[in-house]
Amino acid sequence: MQRRILNSGLASKKNRTAPSESLRPRFIFRFLVLVVSAGTILWPGQGFALPNVHEVAQAVDAHYNRLRSLQANFTEIYQGNGISRTESGILLLKKPGKMRWEYRSPEEKLFVSDGKDAWLYLPNEKQARKSSLKKLEDLRSPIAFLLGKTKLEKELQGLSFAPDVKAWHEGNSILRGVPRAMEDQVQQVLIEVTPESKIARILIDGTDGSLTEYRLSDQKENLEFSETNFRFSPPQGTEVGEGLNGP
């Protein structure tokens, strides 16, 4: 498993048919839930002792706990079931639990939540689906609570460094753990952390053999976002369905 993660951590960018929308949000939702604690830690190359995994986790918690909002460019890479696809766009997060994934490439689509309900909108297909956020089992979901109140060490069992995995950017550290209550869906999660205690990359190794990667860049903190960014009303002529756990 570690060998597959190591080789496919920087997943290829071949277009693919869309995977199930079911697995991706619950994790990133309970996950972009990082918070609480700690102060500044010192990283390799700064001339001091290396931090331990607890210090890194606490610093990540502290960084995101102080934020009211976050904007980032994201790249989502999926490999599994003979499918390979890369998508990208803009991510907006706002306390408490609000998120907007605005996919712009290769096709436009929107995944948005007001903290209570979530919508997936496919404009090219004129389709929209709605689900309660509590019932949603999607790997994007934990990210909604990145600005929340949960400690990283409580979210991930067996948290440790992953020195065998190549970092996206030199100087970053990679953490490895298993998300609690998701052992049936996720074998392990890898989190790449910058020296500034920001999350740069998340890799999710599914029990079905899939690998989903999220890369976050150009992060902008504490911007003012209108509440309308996190609401959705289906345009006229849109076919509306319930539930996001299907393909």
Where are these regions (language model features)?
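N-terminal secretory signal peptides that target proteins for export/translocation
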Residues: M1-R26
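Sec-dependent signal peptide recognition
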Residues: F29-L34
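Flexible, processing/modification-adjacent segments and terminal tails
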Residues: L50-Y78, S84, L122-Q187, P234, ...
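An acidic-aromatic
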Residues: I90-P142, T212
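Gly/Pro-enriched, hydrophobic low-complexity segments
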Residues: K154-L244
